[in-house]
Amino acid sequence: MNKLYTTLLIACLAAGFTACNDDDCEDLHLGNLAHYPIVLKGTFPTESQVLELGETLEITPELLNPEEATYSWLVNGKEYSTEPTFSYKIDNPCRANLTCIIKNKYGKVEMSTSFSSNHDFSKGFFYIADGTFNFYDTEKKVTYPDCYASLNAGKTLGMGNYDSANIIHSNGKFYILIKTSTSNRDHFYVVDAKTLYYENSAVVGANLSGLTILNEQYGLVTGDGIRRIDLKSLNNVTVKDEYMFCFYNSMVYNGKVLTNDTYQKESKVKYYDANELISCLLYTSPSPRDCS
């Protein structure tokens, strides 16, 4: 019996030594594990940090074994700093993901959190300039530039030098139409009007110039033709393929879409039935009627 146990023990030891010949065994050795970057509990925040405008966020992870450790701090996936302490002043309304990677020759540790600003968009107005949203605080008389990017992980509206944008505020949303000749990029954006958070975007059509909101779900987009668009999914269908100014500044009243078909200062106002526009199929736009 003792001989059997001895044989099994030798076999197990042999298997153990054989396994330790693998390249990965060095990393699994207890002596090396003790040298891994170990962050002391409570020195890196796990919950999102909210700061006032003008404050500075500082985070210094404390290591059990800080020797020869290197740091990389990433804000929204882009390296921001390689210092042991992360320091970020909140100059602009912002919302960001933060990643900290600490390495030494034995391994690395990666930690993530997020931070945002406590800001008030109720005392001022948004405007688009240089291809992005800016905010002017009428109380503080301060302009906060590029708020759209700082609140949406660096996203942009992708506007070129010769592009322009129209903004329609409805249903608690900003509907942004990019007038551009580029056909293979997003032209239509949906942004929350209170937070400026991106919600959706789609390729709709080049040279978008106007939007008529028919109800909470549907609208008509004017550009190289008329498209009915689902404002939630952004699925759209062309109901008229000719360029028309009549829907550029139209309005909806009592179920009727009032238009100026000739786009002249003095012309007879006509109307389209809103329900007919909502239900019409591809290239089957109803005809306008005279207002009685």
Predicted features, each with a name:
Residues 2, 13-48, 106-125:
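Bacterial Sec-dependent N-terminal signal peptides
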Residues 54-63:
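A short beta-strand segment in extracellular, disulfide-stabilized domains
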Residues 74-88:
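Surface-exposed, flexible coil segments in extracellular/virion-facing regions
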Residues 116-140:
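An edge-strand/N-cap motif at the start of beta-rich repeat modules
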Residues 144-158, 197-203, 235-241, 277-282:
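A short beta-strand motif characteristic of beta-propeller blades
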Residues 283-288:
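Conserved small/polar residues in nucleotide/adenosyl-binding loops
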